[in-house]
């Protein structure tokens, strides 16, 4: 794809899935024609607690939340990436993952990525202690997918702090890497832009990062600043704090020139041990 139009939705999701879906659809309705891919943030369909995540977790390619997104993709004729939602583990039905799902414009599930790195940290904010591993099983596989806008590598939020994952996605042919996120206000203000631009520069990929913004319950506050960064590290679009869509035009034609002039992939002497799970129609039907 030489040029493509993408919309990154900045949301303030909460505990009510219907309200969250309505918020997503309202933003999609306001988009101009020509948008090929819509990306949503982490926790796009549900921003709640462990009990609620377990209650709403769905089977792969089956469930009411996925059906709503499937119908939305068909209705508006766009690809939609759900930044993350709770899913039942493919390895064990007793465990859940926080997973990013990619649907095509016909509503078919084309790719799934289970978040690899769990946000188990202590932050100097009201919430204080974050322990995703108490709720979720970490993923173990890379996911890359062919889309109308280019070859897409998938990550989620805290994954942004682990450059080896991004290098592995680049090695699997990623031209674009998505980073749906719910960065805290504290960590976002300090690190968000720096990390996004660094990952773009290091891997010579376009970075697309849809974000949560605002307050979610009594103790959670997210940074927002949805952002798109080109392969040279230039910010090509950002939305600081509005609950609205960021529309950007991306192009991947310059990637070849940048990569030929500075062949960092060939120069890299470190190899990831992660096993790639390439997305295709066979994976989607499992």
UniProtKB/Swiss-Prot annotation:
Which keywords label this protein? Hydrolase
Q: Which reaction does it catalyse?
A: N-(4-oxoglutaryl)-L-cysteinylglycine + H2O = L-cysteinylglycine + 2-oxoglutarate
- Describe the location of the CN hydrolase domain by residue ranges: 4-252
Active-site residues (renumbered): 42 (proton acceptor), 115, 157 (nucleophile)
Could you say which enzyme class this protein belongs to?
hydrolase
Q: Does the keyword Hydrolase apply?
A: yes
Give the molecular function GO annotations: deaminated glutathione amidase activity
For whether the record's keyword set contains Cell membrane, the answer is no
Role of this protein: Hydrolyzes deaminated glutathione (dGSH, 2-oxoglutaramate) to alpha-ketoglutarate (alpha-KG) and cysteinylglycine (specific activity 6.50 umol/min/mg), has less activity against alpha-ketoglutaramate (a-KGM, specific activity 0.20 umol/min/mg), very little activity on glutathione and none on L-glutamine. May function as a metabolite repair enzyme.
Recorded protein name is Deaminated glutathione amidase
